[in-house]
Amino acid sequence: MLIYLFEWLSHYFKGLEVFSSYISVRIIMISITSLLITLALGRPMISWLQKMQIGQIVRDDGPQSHFSKRNTPTMGGVLILSSVIISCLLWGNLTSIYLWILILVVIFFGAIGFFDDYLKLVLKHPKGLRAKHKFALQSIFSIVLAIVLFYLLSKNGQMSLSIPFSKSLYIPMGIVIFVVLAFFIINGSSNAVNLTDGLDGLAIVPVVLVAAGLGIYAYIETNSTLANYLLFNYLGNPGLAEVAVFCAAVCGSGLAFLWFNSHPAEVFMGDVGSLTLGAVLGVIAVMVRQELIFFIMGLLFVVEALSVMLQVGSYKLRNGKRIFRMAPIHHHFELKGWPETKVVIRFWIISLILFLIGFAAIKVR
């Protein structure tokens, strides 16, 4: 909404047009806004969660160091999502269909995660929302969204899969392949980030790095000058540039959330945060046609999810034998004797390296 205000004010005050005309300025402003909103609302939110006794449930078979986390305020993801939506309404171009799609993704997956957390933490339902019901809701939404995105993106012929580190190699996709790929990316990312969110600050830093990386790609691909110079397919779909603005909002809010989520965590994001942030990253990757770059930058999430699948498969197929001491894999390292902070920081380092590899693919082609 503010861009319309600044556009009107620019007729009377010279220089204010930068806030409405330059997307780079709005990227900076929305990241600052989302950061400040999260910082401002963080303490009241934590106090309210404590008052309502909405606290973390800790598994008895987990690392002993986790017992101190019991009853730590959870569902802090509401803080992140609210900040992102408010910031987008303030600084986003509200005529962009892509911005509204991302807001809808936040609301839908946020509702699923909120209901799951509410069942577990408030109503004390042991397993929360049943996995099959959660998967069904995610799947229906993802398939419908993938079909919508196919028709939106195909208007400008942007239906090719971009191959990293290649100047001209693109794989064309029809609607079936596109929908299937988008389905697995959105659902897989949502659940992978959810599995990664098991230690203080572990998930939010990789989320911020991946959001920043995808935001950079979105900015380049929707800028004809940069896209031509760097030999990218120019994505000229009206409003698609707002994806970069949205990514900046996620980065700002995520960094502010880390202020409260760093060890020892004062609040956890819960399923309402992790499921939603994962889904949003997947949708963004599909929108900007950088699914493989997303795989590279988000490989930590893939490994976390894969460790769970391997553990479950091994347990069922090998008569109860396990590959890891505990899954997801970050718990395996804890049970090997690594302090929680060392596990988290080393995973952050890995995530940063993956981000840099994905970033290098912009020029090394």
Curated annotation (Swiss-Prot):
One of its GO terms (molecular function) is UDP-N-acetylmuramoyl-L-alanyl-D-glutamyl-meso-2,6-diaminopimelyl-D-alanyl-D-alanine:undecaprenyl-phosphate transferase activity. The gene is mraY. Pathway: Cell wall biogenesis; peptidoglycan biosynthesis. It is found in: Cell inner membrane. Its cofactor is Mg(2+). Keywords: Cell cycle, Cell division, Cell inner membrane, Cell membrane, Cell shape, Cell wall biogenesis/degradation, Magnesium, Membrane, Metal-binding, Peptidoglycan synthesis, Transferase, Transmembrane, Transmembrane helix. The keyword Cell inner membrane applies. One of its GO terms (cellular component) is plasma membrane. It comes from Francisella tularensis subsp. holarctica (strain LVS). Pfam families: Glycos_transf_4 (PF00953), MraY_sig1 (PF10555). This is Phospho-N-acetylmuramoyl-pentapeptide-transferase. GO terms for biological process: cell division; cell wall organization; peptidoglycan biosynthetic process; regulation of cell shape.
